[in-house]
Amino acid sequence: MIVSRFIIKLKTPLHCGGGESLFLDGPVSRDPFGYWNIQGSSLAGVLRASLREIDKDLADSLFGFIKGDLSKASLVWFSDANLLDFDEKRACDKAGNGENVEIKTDSYIRDHVHLQEEGLNRGTSVSGHKFDEEIVPPGAEFAFELKFDEWQYSSDDVQKEKEKFLLLCKIIASSQVRLGGKTVNGYGCFETIYAQYHEVDMRSEDGITQWLNLDNDVCFTSSDAIDIEKDATIVPSKEGYSFDISIPLQNNSMFLPGGVSAKEEDVGTDITCLTTPVLNYKNKTKCIDVYTATGSSIRGAIRHRVFEICNALNLENSLAIEIFGCEADESSKQGKAGLVSCDDAYLKDIKSCVMPHVKIDSFTGGNVDGALFYENPLCGNIGGNIEFDLHMEGRKLTLPQLKILAHALLDLCNGELAIGAGCNKGYGFFKLKGLGEDIKENLSKITLHLFKDGTLLDLSKIDIRESLLSELENA
């Protein structure tokens, strides 16, 4: 028997669906005490899907299968991932024992609007399709454990199955999966801050005694616990091209990532910038509201540019649809998940400024009576710049898809693609930080890990940036 325990910390919002609600379109899952949680079935589903992309037989061996008359039980047991209080104890345990729980699990909402699939160059919304969803804020910490039970194996086969289970643990420790739904919009990204396992021999009397005396704390207290190593080269897909890229962007003008702001200085303003609540366990404080460029907004801007590139090159729109996915078709009733995801960008130490506007009558050229409104775009920090790192991940891409996507990212780096609202006023045009005349020099500032068929490409031997640049010039 192997028991592994983990503590994870959310880097982006999490949305694990919690059924229906009278007041919310998409509530999150909560335990009986009302605290956020991630169900064990959700953890098992994500990790099984990840293993199936690495090795289908490996996934069937650990998680079991049913194939006609053949079947096999799962060897892995999952607990729910329980929310931790600021003292690193399970909030549900403290509530059950009548102890005071400091962390507040209010309802945090994000609004969305559905965009038309046809006429993508317009990017217009569909009437009556505004919806909201509840999120678990970044910074929240959860604890859970996995158990490996090799009861149906002989001692000769146990070592093989143990290695498979430890690979599964390594995937979690390396934060190589995303949890919950909406992952293409950057949700569900986490970092593992604790990962250890403890092994006991259930075939011996001493092992059974160790098992019975094993503590139920969040972390192991025994010195026999072994650290689970991390491996950044694990990729959940061995098909096509996969990548993760981080691009430092900079803007010296206004930026308007529209949404609901919880900051006091934005109260009463007609158009505000979105804020995201972020938990801070170190200072044991309630959520701090941070201005945010959402992953869905960044991904949407890149998506539209990819469609424009396809149209300009007389390529089929199906190339772009395969990259970003599509909703269910009325005839086939089948949708398609996207292959790329973008994380939220949190804009710290950024201030907003009040910009008054008045609607102009196009016939008289004068102002329309009573049509004065205000907006609060972001105007940068003390240095006057707005900076953030764009983080994007992709999987199972073909080479043509990779080239088209690289073309759109180059447009973004060159200040030719806007993010957020107000682009007709010059808002939201970012450039690669420190962009100069030498495009090759500035491309080297981008952090890129590229995999082909599951193998990490050595960029010191294969100048993939040079190759992409050459392909784009030829296109």
Predicted regions and their residues:
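Small/polar/charged residue-enriched interaction surfaces, especially the RNA/DNA-contacting tracks
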Residues: 1-475
